[in-house]
């Protein structure tokens, strides 16, 4: 089947020199991802379990799991009548119906009932929490809509505002709590803070009694419902409802920064601007802005002339603010959307930091504002915006009244700057301009083009997928790593530069050898008597220290980079010889008695010998596991570990020759190509021009196609026939031993698959693979002959093939799709599709829409 992880990546336009744009070649770039890690791991372990067996095993386990959950109930349901008759018989005989424990059916029912109860409780908690949150939001939303004002400095108005609000909240809470079911009013497990206890001791009695009177207005005021037997239970229920309701509200508003000990000024400080100002000036601004009244009800109760005094105090407080113009302009973009709307909802004015003005009736004031805005600009705006007619605030968008104003200065309008990940390709063309397709991992060479097409003047790449650069980082595109910078010294004698590479490992080894030499010099500079004593009393500890020093040197030598650069390889031979000679000199300085007597008997030497023996045994085991034909050719050991990736039924009798190990297509990639061909259009006959051992031929036949397999080597034809018999589709394949160059004019088919030999594993060492000169036969010639059979051609090529040559196969003004085949996120091969096999983005959209309908 076709790979599920497939997508279009880009469109590449190749423009030809000295030709008009209409002759450009369109190259659609796509990627297909397949995985076969399981097959590779099985090859490393040395055994394989058939896919059919795996599927059967998986189905068996799934059936067992399903039977464990559902089969118990089903096993008892068909024999319920028998069980009932047996139970009656047992009961009539006086025998017990059950022994030891309950039946599995009852056990299952009890477990299901417990689960259902837990689910019901969980849903109840969620519903209760959601209901309370909605109730709180609705209550406060109505309060702000009905009471769009800010309290003045008058204490009486403050108390009046707070009392009205608390009464409304209590009445709403009482009416809403009545509707709650009894189960939801049970006391939840909440931590009771000390502040809540103080609050409840102070206000709880009044809240309870007020709500009770609203609930039962017919009762006398002198009655005590908590002592009467008729109303005692109702009072307890009423108490628990209000207690836990107000506790949750208290915790919610306390988390928002509200406290019952704070001044009752409706706490509008939450919506103040975040502009960086002096703390004293900011606090005075908050206090004055909070006292500014916009409600006609309160204005009527105030003393005449108080508005002018309040306005003057506000202006003087704002004038004390010292904010630089740069900070104000910088804060406009950051805090305009967070500051304008909340503060304007409270005061009916726009935030001073936003740089706009709003009159009391909601219409904008048009003012001439200079570029460098002074610090007293907000004061002027508030002074102009003062008035007697107070109206409800309308949302602020680009202008004060929600409409765009051409006279407003552009530097003060809120604007949104796109972030880097939101930029379009057209807006930032330099971000991912990739005319050579470097992000795609393509190779562009200077080889001869097909059909006499001259060189391409330039290329244009348009990416169809977002974040191609980011996604390509996690793919192994087999690119050459960039060479590190090196220090180049120019000698006076010759003009040729001398490259010097500094190795960290080399410097460490030099330091260690220098330290050892200094230590040896100190020991040799001692008196002759001490030297004789050392030779006479040489112990195993001395030899162990020297062994440790030698081991340290060996470890440093082993920690060299396993893949050094070329410059390191050139100088590594002489360096290693010098280092070995120095280490050898150290060994020579050790006294002979110690080296001949102590070291052989040391436990460290014994462990080294044992480790070497174990390594030899492991090597022998690995060699013995390989078949003789594989063990005789060391190059095939790598491919032997990948045998199940090449043929999943390898153990059923698959046969390969030496060249077949190198040239066969991995089964997952071959399966994907066959699936694409079968889904492209209705085709009956497929020609595999170079079938080899039958990797692609078998997959084409498995999709139900009639396959004509051609190869010039009779040995490969026999191997391909044997492998097809293993898969059970030999009757769908016609094997022909012959030269495709001679047989092509006589063939008729719907699709031609080309996978000529690439010249062995050495193809990967080339920077760019020339499909004309590095193939045998000529890659251009076999494509020309294939066009005589059909235009629907699949060309299977190495990953480093010259894309310009592949695109030239489409001809002037033609189209080609180049698909990158990723195996376990590693780029393995590329496949070029021609004719009706090309998947075009427009066709994909129409096909998906038709499938949805």
Curated annotation (Swiss-Prot):
Keyword terms of this UniProt record: Cytoplasm, Methyltransferase, Nucleus, Phosphoprotein, S-adenosyl-L-methionine, Transcription, Transcription regulation, Transferase
Single GO molecular function: RNA cap trimethylguanosine synthase activity
Cellular compartments annotated: Cytoplasm; Nucleus, Cajal body; Nucleus, Nucleolus
Descriptive protein name: Trimethylguanosine synthase
Annotated gene: Tgs1
Residues recorded as bearing Phosphotyrosine in the entry: 144
CDD domains tied to this protein: AdoMet_MTases (cd02440)
Tissue expression: Ubiquitously expressed.
């Amino acid at each position: 089947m076709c790979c599920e992880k497939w997508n279009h990546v880009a469109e590449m336009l190749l423009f030809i020199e000295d030709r008009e744009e209409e002759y450009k070649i369109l190259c659609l770039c796509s990627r297909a991802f397949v995985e076969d890690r399981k097959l590779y791991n099985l090859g490393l372990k040395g055994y394989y379990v058939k896919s059919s067996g795996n599927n059967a095993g998986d189905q068996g386990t799934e059936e067992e799991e399903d039977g464990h959950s559902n089969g118990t109930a089903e096993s008892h349901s068909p024999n319920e009548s028998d069980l009932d008759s047996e139970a009656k018989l047992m009961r009539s005989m006086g025998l017990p119906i059950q022994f030891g424990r309950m039946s599995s059916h009852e056990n299952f029912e009890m477990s299901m009932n417990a689960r259902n109860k837990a689910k019901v409780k969980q849903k109840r908690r969620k519903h209760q929490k959601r209901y309370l949150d909605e109730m709180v939001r609705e209550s406060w939303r109505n309060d702000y809509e009905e009471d769009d004002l800010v309290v003045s400095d008058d204490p009486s108005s403050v108390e009046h505002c707070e009392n009205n609000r608390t009464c409304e909240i209590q009445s709403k809470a009482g009416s809403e709590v009545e509707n709650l079911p009894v189960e939801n009013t049970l006391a939840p497990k909440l931590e009771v803070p000390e502040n809540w206890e103080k609050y409840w001791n102070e206000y709880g009695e009044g809240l309870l009694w007020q709500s009770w009177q609203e609930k039962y207005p017919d009762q006398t005021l002198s009655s005590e419902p908590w002592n009467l037997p008729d109303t005692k239970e109702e009072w307890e229920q009423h108490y628990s409802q209000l207690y836990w309701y107000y506790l949750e509200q208290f915790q919610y508003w306390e988390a928002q920064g509200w406290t019952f000990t704070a001044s009752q000024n409706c706490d509008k400080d939450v919506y103040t601007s975040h502009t960086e100002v002096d703390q004293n000036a900011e606090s005075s601004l908050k206090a004055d802005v909070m006292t500014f009244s916009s409600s006609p009800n309160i204005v009527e109760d105030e003393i005449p002339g108080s508005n002018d005094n309040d306005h003057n105090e506000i202006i003087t407080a704002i004038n004390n603010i010292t904010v630089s113009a740069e900070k104000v302009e910088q804060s406009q973009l950051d805090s305009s959307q967070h500051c304008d709307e909340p503060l304007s909802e409270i005061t009916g004015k726009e935030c001073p930091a936003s740089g706009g003005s709003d009159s009391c009736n909601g219409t904008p004031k048009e003012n001439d504002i200079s570029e460098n805005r002074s610090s007293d600009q907000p004061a002027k705006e508030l002074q102009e915006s003062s008035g007697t007619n107070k109206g409800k605030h309308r949302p602020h968008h680009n202008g004060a009244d929600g409409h765009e104003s051409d006279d407003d200065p552009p530097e003060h309008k809120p604007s949104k700057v796109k972030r880097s990940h939101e930029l379009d390709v057209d807006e930032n063309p330099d971000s991912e301009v990739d005319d050579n397709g470097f992000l795609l991992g393509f190779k562009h060479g200077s080889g001869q083009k097909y059909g006499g097409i001259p060189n391409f003047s330039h290329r244009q790449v348009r990416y169809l997928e977002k974040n191609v650069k980011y996604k390509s980082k996690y793919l192994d595109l087999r690119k050459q790593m960039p060479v590190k910078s090196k220090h180049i010294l120019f000698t006076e004698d010759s003009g040729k530069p001398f490259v010097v590479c500094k190795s960290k490992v080399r410097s460490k080894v030099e330091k260690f050898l220098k330290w050892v030499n200094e230590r040896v010099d100190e020991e040799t500079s001692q008196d002759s008597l001490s030297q004789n004593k050392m030779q006479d009393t040489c112990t195993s500890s001395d030899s162990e220290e020297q062994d440790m020093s030698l081991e340290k040197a060996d470890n440093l030598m082993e920690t060299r980079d396993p893949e050094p650069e070329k410059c390191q390889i050139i100088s590594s031979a002489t360096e290693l010889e010098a280092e070995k000679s120095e280490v050898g000199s150290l060994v020579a300085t050790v006294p002979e008695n110690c080296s001949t007597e102590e070291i052989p008997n040391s436990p460290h030497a014994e462990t080294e010998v044992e480790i070497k023996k174990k390594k030899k045994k492991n090597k022998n085991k690995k060699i013995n596991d390989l078949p003789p034909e594989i063990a005789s050719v060391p190059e095939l050991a790598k491919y032997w570990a990948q045998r199940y990736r090449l043929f999943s039924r390898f153990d059923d009798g698959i046969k390969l020759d030496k060249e077949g190990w190198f040239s066969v297509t991995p089964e997952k990639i071959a399966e994907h190509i066959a699936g694409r061909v079968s889904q492209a259009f209705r085709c009956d006959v497929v020609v595999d021009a170079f079938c080899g051992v039958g990797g692609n031929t078998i997959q084409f036949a498995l999709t139900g196609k009639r396959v004509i397999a051609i190869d010039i080597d009779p040995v490969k034809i026999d191997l391909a026939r044997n492998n097809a018999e293993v898969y059970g589709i030999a009757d769908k394949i016609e094997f022909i031993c012959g030269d495709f160059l001679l047989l092509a004019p006589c063939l008729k088919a719907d699709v031609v698959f080309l996978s000529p030999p690439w010249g062995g594993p050495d193809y990967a060492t080339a920077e760019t693979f020339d499909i004309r000169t590095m193939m045998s036969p000529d890659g251009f010639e076999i494509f020309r002959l294939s066009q005589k059979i059909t235009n629907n051609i699949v060309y299977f090529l190495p990953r480093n093939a010259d894309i310009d040559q592949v695109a030239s196969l489409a001809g002037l003004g033609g189209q080609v799709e180049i698909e990158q085949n990723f195996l376990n996120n590693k780029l393995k091969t590329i496949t070029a599709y021609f004719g009706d096999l090309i998947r075009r983005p427009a066709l994909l959209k129409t096909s998906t829409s038709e499938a949805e309908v």
